[in-house]
Amino acid sequence: MGEGPGYECSGNKLRNIFPSLFTEYSLISMTNYEIADHFSLLSKLMDIHGENSFKSKSYSNAAFNIEKLPKEIREMDDAELFSVRGIGENTGQKIKELVTTGKLSQLEKLLATTPEGILEMLQIKGLGPKKIAVIWKEMSIETLGELEYACNENRLAAVKGFGAKTQENVLQSIRYYQQNQGFHLWAEVEAIANAIMPQLQKAYPNNLFSLTGGIRRQLETVEWIDIISDLDKEKVKAQFETIADTAIEEEPNERLIVKMPNQPTLKFHLTDTTHYYTNLFTSTGSEEFMSAFFDKYQLPEAAKSEEEIFSTNGLQYIPAAMRETADILQKAADNSLNEIIKAEDIKGIIHSHSTWSDGLNTLEQMAKAAIDKGFEYLVISDHSQVAFYANGLSAERVAAQHQEIDTLNDKLKPFKIFKSIEADILGDGNLDYNSRVLETFDLVIASVHSNLKMSLDKAMDRVLTAVSNPYTTILGHPTGRLLLSRAGYPLDHKKVIDACAENNVVIEINAHPRRLDIDWRWIEYAMERGVLLSIDPDAHSVNGFNDVYYGAMIAQKGGLTAKNNLSSFTLAEFENFLEKYKEKKRSKVFA
């Protein structure tokens, strides 16, 4: 399908703000996520324009339900579509319009009367549709630049419903958004790169191709996809110049920039075959790494592999993911690099949610999917009671869930489900639930979910109090960050890690591609202090199990080993860990 022409009405920037509206897909390939994006935007624009709030809410609910459907709408007949919860006659007809024409006429009309800057405000944390409506209709502000200026002039604080605190938060969010324009999550660009590279290799089977730069180093966010090849420049151009709206630019040093619509930029590093591996090596490492390398070592004239480059210089091979700092070269010189973790090393799923709280799949479905994927155990950690927005479990529901787990464990042996909870760290640092309830869990993941805008002192008091709680087993997503969207609250990482070492608390590496939290830069220090880490998917569906791959990739950057990763423990090792942990916990509780 081509682009919906009506969506052009708000200008080209709309492509960048809501790329799913412009994705070139055939009608039969429109996914549930793309359909949900359209309805979510429709709901928000209706609220901004002050239209029927009941209908707006129904479209918002439809977007939420569509995104979580286990089956693609394109595979449903009318009877199946209209039986989906929250999809009535009106919404169902709009879905049919969207999947048959590629656009929504009602959304087109709203986009035609909405300034680009207002649409862009939807990307700013802390600004919902109703606040945006006030900014637009009452303050006559239509761009982010105008809004930033108004904040600097202290005008937003004077508007009813905002205040000084909201104004400061909005200003920070605008600056964070602007700083991150042009960056992409590694998980997103890796998927695109994995589609492009085989096509190139198939088209030119006798040439060499490799990812390089930040994407090869598995950085959590990257600006573009770096590719090195010995392919002729004109052939690279020919491969892409037939794609509509694609711009190709030449740069010095045999670089070619390919800019395709709604895709990350491709940066080709072109080289002759003789120097392919030396150029692969030099284009992979960070500036700090390469500077340190050239201070002490030499490149062989025509290396046949990267391994040869390292061995010629008396260095242990350094995986591409770890070529960030100068320090890693000294470890390679000392032959002290350990084998880093792989996704296959993960034996169990720790941190997952079911339909008991805000998950998509039932507990049994989660367990059976884990079995099918070869995992030995599942730690189910639904949200605690204070998380009302996520259907958090009351004490009574905790007891009922534990009964279901007991039943399933009898049924699914030798696979085992462990009783856990993602307990909210409250404002004072205490955990949700009293000790009688906390005692019933096999392990507790303690996480901050509310009041994320904290000073360093407040954040440290809150987190350290939770870490010192004898029932805390794992500190979940320690900073609360959302990559390219929300900066984490401030922490003194060393003090937090030291406290985890003192209290035998595991630190989570949340594997969700938008979290990857704790930051990989602190993994080495945690291991030095004897702190276990745990690559956990924070899975809210069976598909979420796949995120352990991204957790393993980011953990490689910090040099994490399987023996230092809790989720790499076998079932027997994990049970032994929990038993020893409970003994230590009891000694603290009754001390």
Give the role of each language-model region:
Residues 43, 55-257, 263-265, 273-278, ...:
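Accessory alpha-helical DNA-binding modules that contact the DNA backbone or grooves
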Residues 29-51:
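Charged, compositionally biased N-terminal leader segments and the immediate start
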Residues 2-4:
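Glycine-biased, low-complexity coil/linker segments
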Residues 420-423, 550:
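Active-site catalytic microenvironments in core metabolic enzymes, especially phosphate/sugar-handling
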Residues 17-29:
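Short, Lys/Arg-enriched N-terminal segments with co-localized hydrophobic residues
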Residues 211-214, 348-352, 422:
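Two-metal-ion RNase H-like nuclease active-site motif
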Residues 218-354, 363-374, 379-380, 385-415, ...:
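Charged catalytic cores and adjacent phosphate/nucleic-acid-binding surfaces used
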